[in-house]
Regions:
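Short, contiguous alpha-helical
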Residues: 2-7, 35-82, 123-169
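Acidic/histidine-rich alpha-helical segments that form the ligand environment
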Residues: 83-122, 135-136
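Start-of-helix register in tetratricopeptide repeats
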Residues: 185, 219-220
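"A position-specific structural signal for the A-helix of alpha-solenoid helical repeats
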Residues: 189, 223-226
Length: 241
C-alpha cells in the first residue's frame, strides 16, 4: 500500500541507520534461501526474485537522497508495477551469487547516502511528494523487507513465520520512531497485515490503537483497500465510521 506520511524527528540520520542495520541483518534469512533453482510456478517469486526487488528499491532510495544532497532533481517512481516487472525480468538470468552481492552492495549504498545527507537535508520537504526527504527510506528499507518476508512465508504456507516477520517490522519501526504518529503507523501497518489475511479479531485492536495515537489515519483507512476484507465486521465498521 502507499504509506501515509510519517513525522520528522530529531536524530533522523541515526534512526534511519539503525533500521537499516536491523534490516541488513534480517535479510540474511532470504539470502540463505537464495539459489539458482527456477520457480515451481510462474507467478511465484523465488528468494532470488525477492532479493533483487528489495535491492532495486534500496538503490532508488539512495538515488533520491544523493540527488537531494547534490541539489539535483530527485528520480521519480510513478509506474511502480512496470518497474517491478522490469526488475524481475532483468534478474532472471543473473546468478544467485550476483544477486546476493548486489543486495549487500545496495545496503552499503543506502547507508552512505544517509550518512552524506545533513539532518536539514533529511528533514526537507520531499520534491513532488508529501512528507520529508527521510521518509523515502523506511518504505524501501525495513518496512519493505518485512512485507516481502511475509509474502515469502505465506507462499510457503508458513503463516506463523509470516506473522513473525510483521511483528519484527513493527518492533524495528517503533524502536526507531517513537513519536505518536510513527507509533500509530506501526500499529496500522500490522493491523493491515491481519486484515489482508482476513483476521479481523487480530486486526481491529491494532487499527483502533493507530486511530487513538493519530486520529487523522481514520480518513486514510476509510478507503484503504488493505482493510476491505474486514469492513463488514461490526466492530471494524464501528471504528471506521
Amino acid at each position: 500500500m502507499p504509506y501515509p506520511p510519517l513525522v520528522p524527528e530529531t536524530e533522523v540520520k541515526r534512526r534511519l541507520l539503525e533500521t537499516l542495520a536491523a534490516s541488513r541483518e534480517r535479510e540474511r534469512e532470504l539470502e540463505n534461501l537464495c539459489d539458482d533453482a527456477p520457480s515451481p510456478a510462474p507467478e511465484r517469486w523465488t528468494a532470488k526474485d525477492h532479493l533483487a526487488h528489495l535491492a532495486h528499491w534500496r538503490r532508488y532510495a539512495a538515488d533520491v537522497l544523493a540527488a537531494v544532497h547534490a541539489g539535483n532533481p530527485t528520480p521519480g517512481a510513478d509506474d511502480v508495477d512496470g518497474v517491478n516487472a522490469e526488475v524481475q525480468a532483468a534478474n532472471q538470468e543473473r546468478s544467485a551469487a550476483e544477486v546476493k552481492k548486489a543486495a549487500q552492495a545496495s545496503y552499503a549504498e543506502l547507508a552512505a547516502a544517509i550518512e552524506d545527507c545533513s539532518e536539514d537535508e533529511l528533514l526537507r520537504p520531499r520534491q513532488g511528494r508529501d512528507g520529508a526527504v527521510w521518509e523515502v527510506v523506511p518504505p524501501n528499507g525495513h518496512l519493505h523487507l518485512g512485507e516481502h518476508l511475509g509474502f515469502w512465508h505465506d507462499a510457503q504456507g508458513d503463516e506463523g513465520a509470516a506473522e513473525e516477520a510483521q511483528l519484527w517490522t513493527r518492533d524495528v519501526h517503533e524502536a526507531a520512531f517513537t513519536d505518536p504518529k510513527s507509533l500509530a503507523f506501526g500499529a496500522y501497518n500490522l493491523g493491515c497485515y491481519y486484515a489482508r489475511s482476513g483476521r479481523a479479531a487480530d486486526a481491529i485492536p491494532h487499527i483502533r490503537r493507530s486511530f487513538e495515537l493519530h486520529p487523522d489515519l481514520k480518513d486514510w483507512a476509510r478507503t484503504d483497500k488493505d482493510l476491505d476484507g474486514i469492513r463488514d465486521e461490526p466492530e471494524a465498521h464501528a471504528i471506521l465510521a
